[in-house]
A protein has these predicted regions:
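Negatively charged, low-complexity tracts enriched in Asp/Glu with abundant Ser/Thr
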Residues: 1-47, 61-94
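Amphipathic beta-strand/beta-sheet edge segments enriched in Tyr/Trp
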Residues: 46-57
Length: 94
């Protein structure tokens, strides 16, 4: 169960981070084969994780990155996780 003190972080994850990840997923689906982004949201705790993978022509994963957005983290830690994932994806979308 989510503690009262963490509800603001859960809302930040859902209202700020999640839409950014959904936009990345839409962009990847339209223009970049060989890169995938999977997002998982835990409805009970409000935590979220994202897994990005890069595949070669044989569908072998050649690089990957996982970002975890925990409701117990502060906004700076949540933003750091998002930025880590965004930087990883930038290498393959630039």
């Amino acid at each position: 169960m989510i503690d009262e003190e963490y509800k603001e972080n859960v809302e930040y994850i859902r209202s700020t981070i999640m839409p950014k990840l959904q936009k990345i997923q839409r962009d990847l689906a339209e223009s970049l084969p060989g890169v995938s982004l999977t997002v998982r949201l835990d409805g009970e705790t409000g935590s979220m994780s994202a897994y990005a993978a890069v595949f070669d022509d044989t569908c072998k994963v050649t690089d990957c990155c996982t970002a975890n957005f925990f409701y117990v983290d502060n906004k700076e830690e949540i933003d750091d996780e998002y930025n880590k994932l965004a930087e990883f994806l930038k290498k393959y979308t630039a």
